[in-house]
Amino acid sequence: ENLVAHSGGGEDYIQMYDSPGDDVFTVAPRLATLTGPGYSHAGYGFYVSLGYATSTGGADGAGGRDVAEMQDSTGIDKVKVGDAVGRETTKDTVRVSNWSATDQPYFLRTKGFEEITVLSNGGGDLARIFDSAADDTVNASYDEVTIVTGSNLEKPGIARKKATIRGFESTIAYSVWGGSDTLNLFDSPGDDKVVLRAHKAEMSPRQADTPIFTGRAFSLVHAIASAGAEKYDYVRMHDTVLVDLLVAGYLDGETWASLSKPADGSAMTQMYDALGFDVVRAVNDYGDSPRNKKDVDATVDFLMLDGGWDEI
């Protein structure tokens, strides 16, 4: 069957619901389509477009594998993947919106889809991405940010398996729902700067005043500089109030450094590491009483030390 609905203007909204099979919801400002086994529906001109993957039927008993493809406008838009702790009803949603008085306002939302892609059409957009209660992985570059929901928990609380954000001028990813989340930062072919702190990781072009990507409260951060040959990449690692351990050397011919903090007992847990950077700067923000520790290969020539670091 094929159904088409047209808005006559005003603040009309359309809601579309999936089938027991594999469905695809495609939505952009003033346009929404939902297709699946034996049907295709479309809505035109609606101020608000909502897509729901709520069916539990089908051969898998879970309503199939449903995909959402979303686009924003050419204005200044906002995207929110999931939600903050305490907002249970919206943690499995993806929202795209623009309420600017100078742009044509709209609101798009999906709920319960296993895989979601959001494409920016420019305009100075901001994306915010929230984790699940599982062990999630975020892969971030300037062009694309992907979050993959961990499979370690039987019920991570959301249907989302993967969400991809492409082309956004600024993205913030949050690790707030629990689990042991990992953030992988990938550089560009140009000169890049990464700043790593225990509560926050930032990545930007070296001369930029503000970060393009920010990750907050991730358990582990990997920064990887592998794009392009003629470039100069810089990473700055900050310590904690504890007695941290800095390790630096070469890994398969590439520069490598890591910073770890004390965990239970005498064990150390790695906070972040950096691979392939031209310069690594380790910063002691909390003074020399007691001093941090370091284990640095004698051949290392890429490391800068701020403050006190005692050789182990």
Residue ranges and their predicted role:
Residues 1-312:
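Acidic, glycine-rich low-complexity segments
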